[in-house]
Structures are given as structure tokens and as C-alpha cells.
Amino acid sequence: MSLLKMEYNLYAELKKMTCGQPLSLFNEDGDFVEVEPGSSFKFLIPKGFYASPSVKTSLVFETLTTTDNKITSINPTNAPKLYPLQRKVVSEVVSNMRKMIESKRPLYITLHLACGFGKTITTCYLMATHGRKTVICVPNKMLIHQWKTQVEAVGLEHKISIDGVSSLLKELKTQSPDVLIVVSRHLTNDAFCKYINKHYDLFILDESHTYNLMNNTAVTRFLAYYPPMMCYFLTATPRPANRIYCNSIINIAKLSDLKKTIYAVDSFFEPYSTDNIRHMIKRLDGPSNKYHIYTEKLLSVDEPRNQLILDTLVEEFKSGTINRILVITKLREHMVFFYKRLLDLFGPEVVFIGDAQNRRTPDMVKSIKELNRFIFVSTLFYSGTGLDIPSLDSLFICSAVINNMQIEQLLGRVCRETELLDRTVYVFPSTSIKEIKYMIGNFMQRIISLSVDKLGFKQKSYRKHQESDPTSVCTTSSREERVLNRIFNSQNR
């Protein structure tokens, strides 16, 4: 820990990393406060900030020679086999760490690698290479299984803890496994933080973008007050401000053979309204809709739009164009709606629900990986980050209000490299509720733009359903509306 006065150059360097976001740190009294320029307080500067050689400092950081927390179950023959790009990452990490050791810098590195790169297996290789006792911290238990599989493949002694940290501490008094796989809420326990700071050298923060370290969270406090000897942040979409806690980044681009297509399933609807819809419309401009809660609630009860989504999915699935589908909503009730409707059509052998309230969901996710055809309905919160079903070939985005980081993570669910190359995403920019028509169009255009400009998708117009079924809800009400629709689409390509 280093308590320092906030001199101008230090403040400028830290503030630059926040990209306009308020800079917040722990002060000498232990309060987590916004840092003002010229402040007379001393602040706790995160250890990982000094990982970059561009940060000038006279501070000297302890090295691995001061600890003896070595893995005992290591077997070099169990090291995973890596692809060339993954080996390149390992080479970059080892080279950077040698330089850090020579210059007595903290061994903190962010691995900024694309969705589907294989961050888990690459990090397990690094873990085995370092030979140091390791804590793997995940944001939710959905991610436990993929880590368990890779750690077991390396042959490392490990312990998984997702519930009570108190019972874990009791077990650690008699045994200290080489690898601990825990959920981040364990870091709310100071005794546990002290224990891993003393007995474990390597800390791996998986999906680091899910933590806003400019907030006073358990992870923020852990990194500030109990900084590990070595640390990896793993993410495909790094938060700029989090770099303050891990100020060295390795990013290696991945070329892909995947054929990625995004369809905008557009349609004009007759205006649709109910008493419930009219009630929610009144709240659109109020403070209760600050995070677009009512915008998403309106989408969840937009029956013509919901029917369009169902019609499109059913037609594509029955035709065999797509086979392993992820359906994503923002709200739980919207998820349940689609699940029930699809369950009636295809049955429980095909349709599954990713419900955060069901403790059996992780086991169910594990089981459907072996299926050739399935429909998995879930929420953005539960499955938008870290869902490990590599065989997914299609994604239906039923919600609209999604930030750029969430969009990239969500699209990454269908960008895992497999022998099958076709990947398809469906978005639905139309709504029958006129009060949110342009808002939904703008949000959907952001999803399309990011997928095309950053992730290599090709945008195509989806006309099959509208043309094949003139009686469906997506039929336009007049020839003039069809013309306007084409004009609108051409302007937004």
C-alpha cells in the first residue's frame, strides 16, 4: 500500500485513465471519496497502477523471492496444448514479467483478449508456468464449471467455494489447496482477504469488466488493502478506469474464419395499446425511467413485436437454418413469456430456461452442450457475460437498452471458434408502441453498428418471414408503408 499526496502530475495521470468518469480512491482515513485536484488528503494509490513503466516512481515493490507459496501438485506433462495465438500471448506475458521483475514493478497484467479466444485455457497454462498458489475469482457461479474443467485438465489440486466463506475459512485451517476458485462476494470477508494475501501469490480476476472499480466494492477494497503479489485481469471489453488497478495490457488480435451475419428483422405494425401500456407510457419521461426500466417493460408487453420474434425464430429453427439458439431478454417476465410459448411449440427436450433463481441452471447448461439442437432462453444479466456454450450458432436479441460493453459481451456468446462457421444474430428494431418507436430504432442501430464496425458482422435485411406469410402480424398495412420501410432501411445501413 502506498499513501501519497495527490500531486498534479499524479492526479493528471490517474484522471486520464477514467475517460471523464469521476476518480475515486480510498483516503488516509479509509473513506472512499472522489479525488479533487489539489486535494490536501493522502490517498491509497493502487499497487497495480505502477505496473506500467510509463509511471514514474521511486517506490520499490516486493518480488516473488519474498514468498514461498508454490504449487505442490504441478505436473508439467499436464500443461494444456495451445493454439499459436495463445502461445503468443504466453510469450508476451513472460517477456513483460521479466521486464517488470528487473525494474521492480508489480506483476499485474490485463489480458484483453476477444470473446472466444480461449482466455481460460491460456491463463491455466500461465498458472502452471508460474507454479504459484492461485485464487481464481469469478463474478457468478455460472463461470465456475469452465474453470473447474481446465484446472482439472492441468491436474492441479483445487477447491471450489460458491456459498459460505466462513465454512471455507474453517477448511483452510487444515488444508491449503493449490488453487481456490471462488465467487467475488467472498472478498467481503476481511479474514478471507488476509488469508489469501498471505498464502496465495497469484490472483486472477475473471470478467474484470463486470466490476466498476471506481465504486466502493468488495473487489475494489481487496485490491487496495490486500493487493496480491501477482494479478491477471481477464476481459474482452476492458473498463478504462479499471486500468488504475492493473496498468499493463496485452491485447493480441484474433483473425477468425467465422461467417457472422446480423439480420435486422424490420416491420411496420399497426399501433398497439392496452390500459397497462398507456399507464407505463406516462412514466417514460419521469425519474422512474432513468435506466429505461419502463422502456423495456413496454417491449415485454408489445404483443405484435413478440409475435414477430416468435414467428422468425420458429421459421428459422424449423427450416434448419439455425440449430442452437440463445434468446436474450432484459426482464425476467419477458424471458418467462418466450420460454412458455416456445415450450408449447417444441417441448422440454428442446427448450430450456437460464433462470438465475434456479440453482440447477448451471447443471442444465452443462447438459445441453452435448445437444445438436436446442433453444436456450435467458436474461442479459445471467447469460450476457461468460455463458460457456461454445456450440451456439444463433442469437435473438429481444431487448433494446444495452450498453456497448454488454453488446460486445453478448455477441461474443456466438463467436466461439468451432468446426461450424456460420453465426447469425437477429435484432428487432420495430415496435408497435409509437411512443418508443424512434428510441428503440436508435438503440438497435447501435447494436448493429458495433457488430459491423468492431466485430466483423455483415448486416443483411431479413425479408423471408414477411414475404412468406402475408397474414402474420408483421405484414405492413399499406404499399406506402412498405416503400417508407425500404427508404428507412437504406438510410440506416
Swiss-Prot record:
Residue span of motif DESH box: 206-209
Binding site for ATP: 113-120
Intracellular or extracellular location(s): Virion
Enzyme Commission no: 3.6.4.-
Coiled-coil region(s): none
Range of residues in the leader sequence: none
CDD domains: SF2_C
Domain of life: Viruses
Domain called Helicase C-terminal: residue spans: 309-456
Annotated Helicase ATP-binding domain residues: 100-256
Keywords for the protein's UniProt record, in alphabetical order: ATP-binding, DNA-binding, Helicase, Hydrolase, Late protein, Nucleotide-binding, Phosphoprotein, Transcription, Transcription regulation, Transcription termination, Virion
Any one annotated GO CC term: virion component
Gene Ontology terms: biological process: DNA-templated transcription termination
Single Gene Ontology MF annotation: ATP binding
SUPFAM superfamilies in UniProt: P-loop containing nucleoside triphosphate hydrolases (SSF52540)
Family of the protein in this entry: Belongs to the helicase family. Poxviruses subfamily.
Subunit (UniProt): Interacts with OPG087. Might be part of a transcription complex composed at least of OPG087, OPG110, and OPG145.
Function: DNA helicase which seems to act as a postreplicative transcription termination factor. Involved in ATP-dependent release of nascent RNA. Forms a stable complex with single-stranded DNA, and to a lesser extent RNA.
Protein name per the record: Transcript termination protein OPG145
Organism annotation: Vaccinia virus (strain Copenhagen)
Taxonomic placement: Viruses, Varidnaviria, Bamfordvirae, Nucleocytoviricota, Pokkesviricetes
